[in-house]
Amino acid sequence: MIQAIKNMLGMGPSVDLKQLVKDGAIIVDVRTKGEYTGGHVKGAINIPLQVLGNNLGKLKKEKTIITCCASGMRSGSAKSLLKSKGYTVHNGGGWMSLQNKLR
């Protein structure tokens, strides 16, 4: 049941996000600018979900992308969008949880 929910959110099977970051993955925080300013994963770039589709030029397709947001819902939507455009992408879920995984 839990894995089914994770799949629905675009989180899929567990991957080593820490290793992906070490290997050069880009963290994209899709929360609003105000949310991002209130705290974010070190090194993450902020492209709010509402404008992500218009800002794909900021992301290189040869780089792995990890999306994050507050809870995993918006980052799941971002993952779906980016995947449909040919990006290699993983849903990191909520930013605080992702930050803990990267320590």
Language-model regions, residue ranges each:
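Rhodanese-like catalytic fold shared by cysteine-dependent sulfurtransferases
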Residues: 2-16, 23-25, 33-64, 73-103
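Short, surface-exposed ligand- or partner-binding patches at beta-edge/loop junctions that are enriched
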Residues: 68
